[in-house]
Regions:
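N-terminal pro-sequences and low-complexity stem/linker regions of secreted or lumenal proteins
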Residues: 1-164
């Protein structure tokens, strides 16, 4: 993302992958400008600074650009992107405190991995049921203590698999 709350595709940034840009009621546009900021790198930028200062917000949504999400580039490119970010996240104080969950998901219609990384997850845990974006939304809402939106009451949260 080239600038906070960018509303136009630019280079490898696709606005369609950024949910914050679709909220337009009330103070949403101001909140988008304030809180929807470029990721940066594992070494510098908004997320790296928050990790260094141990001031992560309650919710962080990260979507890679069109190359690092492997839509337009080889899977190995996305693997390298994750290989730089995941260690940075799990070595952070926020993660070590046990309050952070990392979800790695894809937006493809075919069966895809759904990866959950958290200090509370027992290594080797496998979820035997189908997980979709509604289950992720339900889980996120439950973890944040938010009311359930739309169709999420009809899905199962995966919080028991998170050890919570």
């Amino acid at each position: 993302m080239p600038a906070p709350c960018a509303l136009k595709d630019t280079g490898r940034y696709a606005v369609r992958h950024n949910p914050a840009t679709y909220f337009t009621a009330g103070d949403d546009r101001d909140a988008c400008q304030r809180d929807d900021v470029p990721l940066g790198t594992p070494e510098s930028g908004a997320l790296a600074d928050a990790l260094d200062q141990d001031v992560l917000p309650a919710f962080v949504f990260v979507t890679p650009d069109l190359c690092n999400d492997t839509h337009d580039c080889a899977v190995a490119v996305g693997d390298r992107w994750l290989a730089r970010w995941i260690p940075r996240l799990v070595e952070s104080a926020a993660y070590q405190h046990g309050a952070t969950v990392i979800f790695i998901v894809w937006d493809e219609p075919t069966p895809m991995p759904f990866v959950v990384i958290a200090p509370t997850v027992v290594p080797g845990t496998a979820i035997g049921e189908t997980i979709d974006h509604y289950a992720l939304l339900h889980t996120t809402e439950q973890l944040l203590g938010l009311p359930l939106l739309g169709a999420t009451p009809n899905t199962s949260a995966i919080t028991t698999s998170l050890g919570r």
